[in-house]
């Protein structure tokens, strides 16, 4: 039996939020979703998620900066950066900002694999 992670989704596209929620809800607890970086920082403090699925391009700000701030303040919270742009430079910058994974939005299986690596007792 695997542990259910508390997941917060940060994406400004409601269809993406709905799809990711459905994908993850079978094995994890989606505790909330937000559409802006400002709301994200507030939600992290209130909801205390284990994992954040963070869109690279939130409309109100710098997702990489938010990732950096979250991982520095909340060392137990992990961030998976989620983007439709698989540019190696962006991937590098995401990992430098503290993301534990960078996942292409087009491949849901990659997101599931990233979560499997986060659950204690699972190895890939």
Residue map of PLM features:
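Active-site beta3 strand of CheY-like receiver
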Residues: 47-53, 58
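Two-component/phosphorelay signaling modules centered on CheY-like receiver
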Residues: 14-32
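Conserved sequence signature across two-component system core domains
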Residues: 10-11, 34, 52
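Acidic catalytic/metal-coordinating carboxylates
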Residues: 36, 62-65
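Alpha4 helix (beta4-alpha4-beta5 surface) of REC/receiver domains from two-component response regulators
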Residues: 65, 86-103, 109, 113
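Short amphipathic alpha-helix used as the core "switch/output" element in two-component signaling
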Residues: 64-75
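Non-catalytic signal-transmission and effector/linker regions of two-component phosphorelay proteins
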Residues: 1-8, 112-124
């Amino acid at each position: 039996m695997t542990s259910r992670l508390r997941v917060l989704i940060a994406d400004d596209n409601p269809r993406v939020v709905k799809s990711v929620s459905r994908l993850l809800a079978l094995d994890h607890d989606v505790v909330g979703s937000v559409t802006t970086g400002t709301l994200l920082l507030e939600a992290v403090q209130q909801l205390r998620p284990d994992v954040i699925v963070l869109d690279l391009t939130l409309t109100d700000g710098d997702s990489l900066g938010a990732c950096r701030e979250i991982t520095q303040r909340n060392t137990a919270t992990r961030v998976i950066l989620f983007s439709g742009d698989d540019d190696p430079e962006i991937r590098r910058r995401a990992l430098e900002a503290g993301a534990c994974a960078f996942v292409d939005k087009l491949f849901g299986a990659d997101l599931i694999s990233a979560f499997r690596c986060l659950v204690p007792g699972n190895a890939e």
